[in-house]
From Swiss-Prot:
Coiled coil feature spans: none
UniProt similarity note: Belongs to the archease family.
Protein species of origin: Methanosarcina mazei (strain ATCC BAA-159 / DSM 3647 / Goe1 / Go1 / JCM 11833 / OCM 88)
Matching NCBIfam families: PRK00407.1 (NF001617)
Binding site for Ca(2+): 16, 145-146
UniProt xrefs under Gene3D superfamilies: Archease domain
Name of this chain's protein: Protein archease
GO biological process: tRNA splicing, via endonucleolytic cleavage and ligation
Top-level division of the source organism's lineage: Archaea
Pfam families linked: Archease (PF01951)
Length: 146
């Protein structure tokens, strides 16, 4: 992994939050991007529940699938009030020109007293979005609107 063991890191950005996520596989980079995003919202080390949500999505390309994946998790947080800390992407596959993801997100009910709110994310953006296979695995760059 080119990140020297890191799952993700935050980068400088003028108005929003930008991060790089790393993984040995495309599935792992999607998991680590989700972890990076949720650590913007809350401290995921304070989450331990096993409430699961299954995520099944289809998109025209891998970059769109990454944005859709993160956007769906953000939607589940906002609507179901579940904070996630563990992500298991079971499969990402390409079929007939479309990409699909099958994944589980684990967490617990959001309680402000248990999960101090760090930063509100309004949306996952396509701004400066990158997803690429590298010599040591995969790397994704994501900007979220705050």
């Amino acid at each position: 992994m080119p990140s020297q063991g890191k799952k993700y890191e935050y980068l400088e950005h003028t108005a929003d939050i930008k991060f790089l996520a790393y993984g040995e596989t495309v599935e792992e980079v999607f998991e680590n991007a989700a972890l990076a995003m949720f650590n913007v919202i809350i401290d995921t080390e304070k989450v331990s529940g096993e409430t699961e949500r299954e995520v099944l999505l289809t998109s025209p390309d891998l970059e769109s699938l990454l944005v859709d994946w993160l956007s769906e998790l953000l939607y589940l947080f906002e609507v179901d009030e579940v904070v996630f800390w563990k992500f298991q992407v079971e499969e990402i596959r390409e079929e007939e020109g479309e990409y699909s993801i099958k994944a589980l997100a684990s967490g617990e009910k959001y309680y402000p007293e248990s999960h101090p709110f760090e930063t509100e994310i309004k949306a996952v953006t396509y701004n400066q979005l990158e997803l690429e296979k590298t010599a040591g695995g995969w790397k994704a760059q994501v900007v979220v609107d705050i």
